[in-house]
Design a protein with these regions (language model features):
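The right-handed parallel beta-helix/beta-solenoid scaffold, focusing on the short coil/turn
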Residues: 5, 42, 53, 65-67, ...
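Acidic Gly/Asp/Thr-rich repetitive segments characteristic of extracellular carbohydrate-active
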Residues: 11-68, 103-104
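Extracellular beta-strand-rich solenoid/capping regions of secreted or surface-exposed proteins
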Residues: 36, 51-70, 77-114, 123-142, ...
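Short glycine/acidic-rich loop motifs that flank beta-strands on beta-rich extracellular proteins
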Residues: 51-56, 80-81, 124-130, 150-154, ...
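Surface-exposed loop/turn segments connecting beta-strands in extracellular beta-rich domains
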Residues: 53-54, 78-79, 110, 118, ...
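Ser/Thr/Gly-rich low-complexity blocks that favor extended beta-strand/coil architectures
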Residues: 122-124, 148, 173-225, 366-403
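Small/polar beta-strand repeat architecture
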Residues: 210-255, 387-431, 439
Length: 579
């Protein structure tokens, strides 16, 4: 409690019966550490090795004397067998919320902490949340690299294609078996037939990657092992094998995330790496002031892998304050590297003049604490996506996991229509993404749906499989809110991305240029090296400015629908010229 004490953990030489106060008498597990209440200036020194329990420190430092947790250089293996397991509702990941999830690092109700590594590699085994922050404040992670010994995505390279068969080389990390003439992927606590979702990667084309649905294994009639990680696959007709390509295999059941940040603030990742993330990457939910600075979301150099994330890399749902992603490498995601949005809840009832019953509509997002008293909400037309009233929450009552009753300070509007929705507008963040590089990406680059200022500057997008930037807003499909009011896309380089490269596509069914969904979007001084002729598509925007850009096409590469206040000027077109 008094602080200033140093504790030592060494799983190879330690003993939990030791005092843990000297390097020569360390503890062997995290159990004694987890039993402490750490204070200002306390430090925990951890040596490499294998752990079977969660690191779960408690206590509080101060801004001047934070708690320090230091990992020495080396390999750390975290196994889920004795880990803390929690039932969690995680945005966009809720296919199985009632099975408790194992957690490797849990920072809960803790303040002012510095976690540092020095060439430190953290390997998790099985489906585990690598790092969770729950009601944490002022925590900085530095110098840690996270990975899996057995990733949740399996890979093989097509070595040769001949008449009636193909020879493939399976990545050594992708353990497998051949059972009853079928190939089965074997993980730590899971197995898969490899037919849920496949992606194909072409290393000779800058790692360009695209989705293939169920993939080629469904067309294989027989499998024959020809070496430790070499398999000959027989077919009557080639189901899509091309020599030199890498095929990636994963399931689509969303039951985990690599990281989870809930009701936390001032969390910083600096000089870290995520070489593989299971599930939805790092999901930040109703948290604020989050920074990712010089973080590599990419396969470990020299590993031979092409995948670093099972789905999104960074997912922000219902956050506020300032989100900063700077100088990050984002390579090898199976979904969007960055997604920022709120959640529309459908109005399903009005039991009293000051009350409304709301429902989570998407099957992968529910059970979340979406409102607290004092939050401001907007009533939104599901057809036009236009807000028509605001109010303030005074009370919240959960009605199971999928419905919530909120009481409001003022009477509800009289003109609510069936299927209209509500957005919590207190929890909307500003976003800055600078000097990042996106590659080996089958989906969009960045999805941005927030009314606070957005700056996308000096990034490189290389051959994204879908639009490099998507600004959406919808109340009928994913129910991801909301409108943008101040977006600057400046100084970026887009190289042969799928088109439209910048796609402003709200899902409003009633379209009126006098009633736009989005406002004030500036696309300035960017370079568009296009594969075709469509750089920008914009729907339902008031105040769209496209100036100073370089387009590698002589056609006008801007398409607008129901927009007003459009300025397209001073752009340079043709043969890759730069403005």
């Amino acid at each position: 409690v008094n602080g200033g004490t140093v504790y030592f953990v060494d799983p190879r030489t330690g003993d939990d019966a030791n005092a843990g106060l000297t390097p020569g008498k360390p503890w062997c597990s995290f159990r004694p550490v987890n039993a402490l209440r750490l204070g200002p200036g306390d430090r925990v020194e951890i040596r490499p090795g294998t752990f079977h329990e969660t690191l779960m420190p408690m206590g509080a430092g101060t801004a001047g004397k934070p708690i320090e947790i230091r990992f020495a250089s080396g390999d750390y293996d975290f196994h889920p067998d004795n880990a803390v397991r929690l039932k969690l509702h995680i945005s966009n990941s809720n296919d199985d919320p009632y099975t408790p999830k194992a957690v490797a690092f849990l920072f809960q109700d803790i303040r002012h902490v510095r976690i540092t590594g020095n060439r430190t590699d953290i390997y998790v085994h099985g489906k585990m949340i690598q790092t969770m922050f729950d009601h944490a404040e002022d925590v900085v992670l530095t110098g840690l690299a996270f990975d899996y010994r057995r990733p949740l995505v399996s890979e093989f390279t097509v070595v040769k294609v001949a008449e009636g068969h193909a020879d493939v080389r399976i990545h050594p990390d992708s353990t497998y078996a051949i059972e009853n003439d079928r190939l089965v992927w074997l993980g730590e606590g899971w197995r898969s037939a490899g037919t849920d979702l496949n992606q194909e990667c072409d290393p000779s084309d800058d790692g360009r990657v695209w989705r293939r649905g169920s993939g080629p294994l469904t067309g294989v009639t027989r499998f024959e092992r020809t070496g430790p990680f070499e398999v000959r696959m027989f077919f009557d007709q080639n189901p899509g094998f091309t020599a030199g390509r890498v095929i990636q295999f994963r399931e689509t059941f969303r039951d985990c995330a690599a990281g989870f940040v809930r009701r936390s603030r001032n969390i910083v990742w600096r000089d870290c790496a995520y070489h593989f993330m299971g599930g939805m990457g790092i999901v930040s939910q109703f948290s604020e002031d989050l920074t990712f600075d010089h973080v590599a979301f990419a396969p470990r150099p020299g590993s031979g892998r092409t995948t670093s994330s099972w789905a999104d890399m960074l997912h922000f749902s219902g956050c506020r304050g300032r989100i900063v992603v700077a100088d990050c490498e984002m390579s090898g995601s199976h979904d969007d590297p960055i997604n920022v949005h709120g959640t529309h809840l459908r109005i399903t009832g009005q039991p009293a003049s000051h009350q409304i019953l709301l429902r989570f509509m998407h099957g992968q997002t529910y059970g979340i604490e979406a409102f607290v008293p004092g939050d401001e909400v907007e009533f939104v037309s599901h057809l036009s996506l236009r807000a028509y009233a605001t109010n303030v929450v005074t009370a919240v009552e959960a009605k199971g996991d999928k419905e919530v009753l909120i009481t409001l300070a003022s009477p509800c509007p009289a003109d609510i229509e069936a299927n209209d929705v509500v957005e919590n507008i207190t929890w909307t963040p500003s976003v800055e993404v600078r000097n990042c590089r996106v590659s080996v990406d089958s989906c969009r680059g960045f999805l941005l749906s927030t009314r606070q200022p957005v700056l996308i500057e000096n990034n490189v997008f290389l051959k994204t499989g879908m639009s490099a930037i998507l600004i959406a807003d919808d109340a009928n499909s994913w129910f991801e809110s909301g409108p943008v009011r101040d977006v600057m896309i400046r100084g970026n380089t887009f190289i042969k991305c799928s088109e439209p490269v910048v796609n402003i596509a709200p899902e409003n069914h009633t379209v009126n240029p006098d009633a736009p969904v989005h406002r004030n979007i500036r696309i300035m001084n960017n370079t568009f090296d296009l594969a075709g002729d469509m750089a920008i598509s914009a729907k339902s925007v008031h105040g769209l400015t496209v100036t100073g850009n370089g387009f590698s096409t002589r056609k006008l590469p801007v398409h607008t629908v129901a927009c007003a206040g459009v300025v397209i000027a001073d752009n340079v077109q043709g043969d890759g010229q730069h403005p």
